[in-house]
């Protein structure tokens, strides 16, 4: 939701923010 990181939750925008 901040910067483009690795798509953990399938979303590149919620990468490091939405870790499973």
From Swiss-Prot:
One of its GO terms (cellular component) is plasma membrane-derived thylakoid membrane. Its main location: membrane. Keywords: Membrane, Photosynthesis, Photosystem I, Thylakoid, Transmembrane. It comes from Thermostichus vulcanus. It is a multi-pass membrane protein. It is found in: Cellular thylakoid membrane. This is Photosystem I reaction center subunit XI. GO terms for biological process: photosynthesis. Coiled coil: none annotated. Belongs to the PsaL family.
């Amino acid at each position: 939701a901040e910067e483009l990181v690795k798509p953990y939750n399938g979303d590149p925008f919620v990468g490091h923010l939405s870790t499973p």
